UniProtKB/Swiss-Prot annotation:
It comes from Cynops pyrrhogaster. The gene is COL1A1. The lineage of its organism: Eukaryota, Metazoa, Chordata, Craniata, Vertebrata. Residues 23-148, 1205-1450 form a propeptide. Residues 1215-1450 form the Fibrillar collagen NC1 domain. The modification 5-hydroxylysine is found at residues 251, 416, 491, 737, 848, 1019, 1082, 1094. One of its GO terms (cellular component) is collagen trimer. This is Collagen alpha-1(I) chain.
């Protein structure tokens, strides 16, 4: 009989060995039970409710209620655990049943043998298995050159798909290039197709024991046991307590006579009476001595059962009874009280190894039961003796990261790679050390002819000979002495470009270029054909354990087992004392080979191997694009003089050099013989005058000569006296505009303005040279965790978990009877691995297995041969503009522009949004070119661009090289089915079943031993750089797989550390000469060569520049006065002279205008009495001004002297002043309240509306720039709103066909004023206005307005203006061009879009229609509109016209 622990171990072993295989439904055996959608196997026990327990018996369900009355609970706080029926005491306080002792009842029959108990706790971890065989080949590697695949179909103008030509023969291998810096990380590639499954590896040896697990929760009750055999009779019990009084016994024997009584009085003798009644019993006498034992009486009838006596001491074990027949399974009994633990039995002998059973069919999936509450931990027991190694436990959580291991040894040198792509042109290297002097250069061309020597001193005058005849040309004279070198002439014009010189020697390798930006991800290529399996690689390190798989469905019920062992286990007893260690068992047979381990992760990169042998010569690469001009090198040493060169072609004549120094006086030549007379030469220039000859005799008087030519102009005569002033001339015509004045001096430097808004993105500059790599930045802060990755593939089924810790030792049980010999025991734990046995014979090949699941991807294959250069791919999408780089050095200051009108100084506002482009100023004169600025520091890297669109699907790649065939596996023939033996050792894990439903989350287990490495999951988003981990063990290289498609480019990786330099390889074959390098910097002048021989006479030089001015000649004699010149222009006004002395009084002027009537004067003196007459007027002052004045007697010539009492004159003066004041007052009033007339224009219509709110809308004159009113313009004022509306110069454009396209199907926007013949840009200002004046006034209007609007009406015939009714979109809508040259569209950014109030140009009807376009904006610089560009024009039947509305500012 097994103990309960053994029983649990058996169940645990069976659970670990179970292979989950998917079988068809028809394989499921009958005998199952179904209840509420759940299927139970035969003999399954379950509790549908806590107080109901059911059992499945060959398809029948039998249920019974659980009663709790037999075990009353005696504690104050009893509780019913979750899922249980009966109350229990929480921590053992109180008693769970009363301790009244009853009479011992009769012994019950032995119960039936119980079913197998629940699985026990998992054993400890086993030792780590041996490494598995190498995995199958990895996934295909990255693709090669995708350019040919991506180029098809992109060029819209190509005549068809360009088909690549046949591949040329592979050129000889070039020498290895320098290692480039690591390229950017590629984007994650799509998952490869699953590979074929790898061969199963050998089973590893048993692992080391894991640490003891936590005590498991109590298992559910086991199935009810079958009735046991009848036990032997128990020993006699102890004496019971006295029984209750029995019933009265039967009548006893007659007693002895009593003693005589005292003598009574003598009575009279009576007659003999009847016998009297018996007397009462006398008092009992004293007990007599004990008599002899009597004979044994007959057994009486059994009395009623007495109360239960105390338990007797155990008797000796009786002999075993015969085995009873197996009874039917009883209902589960109530849980019995826990018995004491019996002593450990001796170890049974080792049973034979059973044959491996066939895997059972999987049973239907059971419903997941509710998760029980975790029990409280028990008290820790005493330390037990070391147990035998348990079954390998489940992998624990990964341990803490170990310290980094030591650097692994350098790997063997890898095979030589193909030539790398040529790197980008490196930066110019540092100037080399001074070279050895080069060989002598070729002889230079002959120098310019020397200057003539000094003129010799004058010879003695010879006698004058008679003129001879002209002589023949003399032979060449003997060579003269060379003249001294003249100064070099000015530099000649540059010659034509010489032919390309021979290629220079190959330069040293430049530094690696910066890695390019990540390319667009290539399309997924077709899957290559799988390579044949490679040889087994070395075992990789164990991967991390995968997560526990979901529980598989229960298997089908097995064949009916033998009778079960003990019945239900009782509740958990208190922990017993630790038992003694058992003897060491016999070593078991070696276990079967374990499944292969998972491939390890790739090891850390080894150091670079030694340099490979030199490759063959590579084909000449295409010429690289010329690099940027390098900085000038340091000057080299002077070369040696060159060898004399061949005679060069005569150069262009140089300009005459400056005069050389005067030569030394030459030796006088020998006198030559007289030559024959030459032909008459041209008249020589007059010789210098000879010395005076002897005075001749006086000749005869000559005839008078003719009139000589006028002499040279004489010196100016002395200044004449001022003439009389001339009459006043007519007003001259307006002069032409003077030339621009010289630029004024630079003004004082202004205050630094606020930082302007960022300008618009410039056009992309040429790619700058790669800067040097910056120093590695500090490790960044840990990034936030990445997004949750895709769930990983289900891990392999975990191995069984470790067994729980030993429970407390139970109380000692009663000794049982010695049982019969038990069945063969479960196989013992595996002993230590034995020495390997001799190799068995190769078995016959087994039947072909089913196709395995796809294996993990193979390793990257060898790179294929480099393909031919494909046609260029299409341009990628433009990246987002980078941030503006820092400004260059300040250029030289331009010339000063024209002075603008002074603005009012405002408070400095905050920096506004970027202003509109200003009107194009007249260009300033070009300033001198500034020195090139030093390059600015590299700008901050822009944000990462969005991931590009995937490229086109690439062509199918070439198949990878087939790997060498693997060795055939050894597989024996399948043996005959043996009888069902005891469970064998743990088999290899089966194929993964389908994932079950996820279970409820369990309580966390204790920390396990570090698990094996898991297979790598799919790549997550790039995290921040973590701390560097320890290097993994290097994996064996896998067989090369086919080349896979290129992954997406990942984020650019950080620059890796430089590997150790390998030893230098042998020199490669000399390459073909490369393309000519960029022209080098000009070398320094060489040392002066030796003086060359005199060259041939050069050609006549070109006319030299005028020489420097000679020294002033002597003052000539004054010439005669010339005729008077024409009258000069009037001179500028002189400065004001000093005040002159007061002049004489002028003549009396003419009389002034008549004064106004004076006020009434004071009363005159009384007149003399008049003659009597009619009554006169009332007395009062008369105005004598109307009376004729007698002539004054004091007239004095023309002058007239006023007297203070001459009232008329005073009045005239007052009237004049008054008129002037009134005029000034009116002018001031006009300034304050302008009238909008041409003479008195307002500034804007808004001003007019504010001053004259009752005026009506109409045309008025305005002068926004104020100042002189000659440039005022006529506008329309809307007096309701205050808008100022400026009319166009030409308000309508005639309706006709304005444009016919050469290619009508190619629709594009065509600007009316810029492209169409006879078109023009729109101007504004109404009739008679100067467009230049209007533009200035519009500039001021825009400054004073906050809003502008304008309408344009587009008349159409068969031309779409806005909405295209056929397509329902705005693709054919017209474009408008604003004053600041910005384009205003129908759709897009709402700030640059116009609307329409009427749209009658939506389709081609052959009739005229119109669309009214309206644009309103707060960016006043965009209006007025100056051009329009329709798209739907170009055919002869498409016509349009335009009405241009006024532009209105508010």
């Amino acid at each position: 009989m097994f103990s309960f622990v053994d029983n649990r171990l058996l169940v645990l072993l069976a659970a670990c060995v179970l292979l989950v295989r998917a079988l068809d439904q028809e394989d499921i055996e009958s005998g199952l039970c179904h209840q509420e959608g759940t299927t139970y196997s035969d003999k399954d026990v379950w509790k549908p409710e806590p107080c109901v327990i059911c059992v499945c018996d060959n398809g029948n369900i039998m249920c019974d209620d659980v009663t709790c009355g037999d075990y009353p609970v005696d504690c104050p706080n009893a509780e019913i655990p979750f899922g249980e029926c009966c109350p229990v005491c929480p921590d053992g306080d109180g008693t769970s049943y009363s301790e009244q002792t009853g009479v011992e009842g009769p012994k019950g029959e032995v119960g039936p043998k119980g079913d197998r108990g629940l699985p026990g706790p998992p054993g400890r971890d086993g030792n780590p298995g041996l490494p598995g065989p190498p995995g199958p080949p990895g996934p295909p590697g990255l693709g090669g050159n995708f350019a040919p695949q991506m180029s098809y179909g992109y060029d819209e103008k190509s005549a068809g798909i360009s088909v690549p030509g046949p591949m040329g023969p592979m050129g000889p291998r070039g020498p290895p290039g320098p290692s480039g810096s690591p390229g950017p990380q590629g984007f994650q590639g799509p998952s490869g197709e699953p590979g074929e499954p790898g061969a199963a590896g050998a089973l590893g040896p048993r692992g080391l024991p894991g640490p003891p697990g936590k005590n498991g929760d109590d298992g559910e009750s086991g199935k009810p046991g079958r009735p046991g055999e009848r036990g032997p009779s128990g020993p006699q019990g102890a004496r019971g307590l006295p029984g209750t009084a029995g019933l009265p016994g039967m009548k006893g024997h007659r007693g002895f006579n009593g003693l005589d009584g005292a003598k009574g009085d003598n009575g009279p003798a009576g007659p003999k009476g009847e016998p009297g009644n018996p007397g009462e019993n006398g008092a009992p006498g004293q007990a007599g001595p004990r008599g002899l034992p009597g004979e044994r009486g007959r057994p009486g009838a059994p009395g009623p059962a007495g109360a239960r006596g105390n338990d007797g001491s155990p008797g000796a074990a009786g002999p075993p009874g015969p085995t009873g027949p197996t009874g039917p399974p009883g209902f589960p009994g109530a849980v019995g009280a826990k018995g004491d633990a019996g002593p450990q039995g001796s170890r049974g002998s080792e049973g034979p190894q059973g044959a491996r059973g066939e895997p059972g069919a999987p049973g239907p999936a059971g419903a997941a039961g509710p998760s029980g509450n975790p029990g409280t931990d028990g008290q820790p027991g005493g330390k037990g003796a070391t147990g035998s190694p348990g079954i390998a436990g489940a992998p624990g959580f990964p341990g803490a990261r170990g310290a980094p291991g030591p650097q692994g040894p350098a790997g063997a040198p890898g095979p030589k790679g193909n030539n790398g792509e040529p790197g980008a042109q490196g930066n110019k290297g540092e100037p080399g050390a001074k070279g050895e002097p080069g060989p002598a250069g070729v002889q230079g061309p002959p120098g310019p002819s020397g200057e003539e020597g000094k003129r010799g001193s004058r010879g003695e005058p010879g006698p004058a000979g008679p003129p001879g005849p002209a002589g023949e040309r003399g032979g060449p004279g003997s060579r003269g002495f060379p003249g001294s070198d003249g100064a070099s002439g000015p530099k000649g014009a540059p010659g034509e470009r010489g032919s390309v010189g021979p290629a220079g020697p190959k330069g040293s390798t430049g530094e690696s270029g910066r890695p390019g930006e990540p390319g667009l991800p290539g399309a997924k290529g077709l899957t290559g054909s799988p390579g044949s399996p490679g040889p087994d690689g070395k075992t990789g390190p164990a991967g991390a354990a995968g997560q526990d798989g979901h529980p598989g469905p229960p298997g089908p019920s097995g064949a009916r087992g033998q009778s079960g062992v003990m019945g239900f286990p009782g509740p958990k007893g208190a922990a017993g004392e630790p038992g003694k260690s058992g003897e060491r068992g016999v070593a078991g047979p070696p276990g079967a080979t374990g499944a292969p381990g998972k491939d390890g992760e790739a090891g850390a990169q080894g150091p670079p191997g030694p340099s490979g042998p030199s490759g063959e010569r590579g084909e000449q690469g295409p010429a690289g694009s010329p690099g940027f001009q390098g900085l000038p090198g340091s000057p080299g040493p002077a070369g040696e003089a060159g060898k004399p060169g061949e005679q060069g072609a005569p150069g262009d004549a140089g300009g005459p050099g400056p005069s050389g120094p005067r030569g030394e006086r030459g030796f006088p030549g020998e006198r030559g013989g007289q030559g024959p007379a030459g032909a008459q030469g041209p008249r020589g220039s007059p010789g210098s005058p000879g010395n005076d000859g002897a005075k001749g005799e006086a000749g005869a008087a000559g005839a008078p000569g003719g009139r000589g030519p006028p002499g040279l102009q004489g010196m100016p005569g002395e200044r004449g006296s001022a003439g009389m002033p001339g009459a006043k001339g007519d007003r001259g015509d307006a002069g032409t505009k003077g030339a621009d004045g010289a630029p004024g001096k630079d003004g004082a430097r202004g205050l630094t303005g606020p930082i302007g808004p960022p300008g618009p993105s410039g056009a992309p500059g040429d790619k700058g040279e790669g800067g040097p790599s910056g120093p590695a930045g500090p490790t960044g802060a840990r990034g936030s965790p990445g997004e949750r990755g895709e769930p990983g593939a289900p891990g392999p089924a975990g191995i069984c978990g470790p067994p729980g810790a030993d429970g407390q030792p139970g109380a000692k049980g009663e000794s049982g009877d010695a049982g019969p010999k038990g069945d063969a025991g479960a196989p013992g734990p595996a002993g230590p691995t034995g020495a390997p046995g001799p190799a068995g014979n190769v078995g016959a090949p087994g039947p072909k297995g089913t196709r395995g699941a796809a294996g993990p991807p193979g390793a990257t294959g060898f790179p294929g041969a480099a393909g031919r250069l494909g046609p260029p791919g299409p341009s990628g999408n433009a990246g987002p503009p980078g941030p503006p780089g820092p400004g260059g050095k300040e250029g030289a200051k331009g010339s000063r522009g024209e002075t603008g009108p002074a603005g009012r100084s405002g408070e400095p506002g905050p920096a506004g949004p970027p202003g509109p482009s200003g009107e194009k100023g007249s260009p300033g004169s070009d300033g001198p070119a500034g020195a090139p600025g030093i390059p600015g520091p590299q700008g901050i890297a822009g944000q990462r661009g969005v991931v590009g669109l995937p490229g086109q699907r690439g062509e199918r790649g070439f198949s990878g090289l087939p790997g060498p065939a693997g060795e055939p596996g050894k597989q024996g023939p399948s043996g005959p089915n043996g009888e069902r033996g005891p469970p064998g050792p743990s088999g290899p894990p089966g194929l993964g079943g389908p994932p079950g439903e996820p279970g409820r989350e369990g309580s966390p287990g204790s920390e396990g031993a570090p698990g094996r490495d898991g297979s790598p999951g799919p790549k997550g988003d790039r995290g921040e750089n973590g701390p560097s981990g320890p290097p993994g063990a290097p994996g064996a290289p896998g067989a090369p797989g086919p080349v896979g498609p290129a992954g997406k480019n990942g984020d650019r990786g950080e620059t890796g550390p430089a590997g150790p330099a390998g030893p230098a390889g042998p020199s490669g074959v000399r390459g073909a000469p490369g393309p000519a390098g960029a022209r080098g910097d000009k070398g320094e002048a060489g040392e002066q060569g030796e003086r060359g021989m005199k060259g041939h006479r050069g050609f006549n030089g070109m006319q030299g520049p005028p020489g420097p001015p000679g020294s002033s000649g002597e003052q000539g004699a004054p010439g005669p006065s010339g005729p008077a010149g024409p009258r000069g222009p009037p001179g500028s006004s002189g400065s004001t002279g000093k005040d002159g002395v007061n002049g004489l009084p002028g003549p009396i002027g003419p009389p002034g205008p008549r004064g106004r009537n004076g006020d009434v004067g004071p009363a005159g003196p009384p007149g003399p009495p008049g003659p009597p007459g009619p009554p006169g007027p009332p007395s009062g002052g008369f105005d004598f001004s109307f009376m004729p004045q007698p002539p004054e007697p004091k007239s004095h010539g023309d002058g007239r002297y006023f007297r203070a009492d001459d009232a008329n004159v005073v009045r005239d003066r007052d009237l004049e002043v008054d008129t002037t004041l009134k005029s000034l007052s009116a002018q001031i009033e006009n300034i304050r309240s302008p009238e909008g007339t041409r003479k008195n224009p307002a500034r804007t219509c808004r001003d007019l509306k504010m001053c004259h709110s009752d005026w009506k809308s109409g045309d008025y004159w305005i002068d926004p720039n104020q100042g002189c009113n000659l440039d005022a313009i006529k506008v329309h004022c809307n007096m309701e709103t205050g808008e100022t509306c400026v009319y166009p110069s030409q308000a309508s454009i005639s309706q006709k066909n304005w444009y016919t396209s050469k290619n009508p199907r190619e629709k594009k926007h065509v600007w009316f004023g810029e492209t169409m013949s006879d078109g023009f840009q729109f101007e504004y200002g109404g009739e008679g206005s100067d467009p230049a004046d209007v533009n200035i006034q519009l500039t001021f209007l825009r400054l004073m307005a906050t809003e502008a609007s304008q309408n344009i009406t587009y008349h159409c015939k068969n031309s779409v203006a806005y909405m295209d009714q056929e397509t329902g979109n705005l693709k054919k809508a017209v474009l408008l061009q604003g004053s600041n040259e910005i384009e205003i569209r129908a759709e897009g950014n709402s700030r640059f879009t116009y609307g329409v109030t009427e749209d009658g140009c939506t389709q081609h009807t052959g009739e005229w229609g119109k669309t009214v376009i309206e644009y309103k904006t707060t960016k006043t610089s965009r209006l007025p509109i100056i051009d329009i560009a329709p798209m739907d024009v170009g055919t002869p039947d498409q016509e349009f016209g335009i009405d241009i509305g006024p532009v209105c500012f508010l």
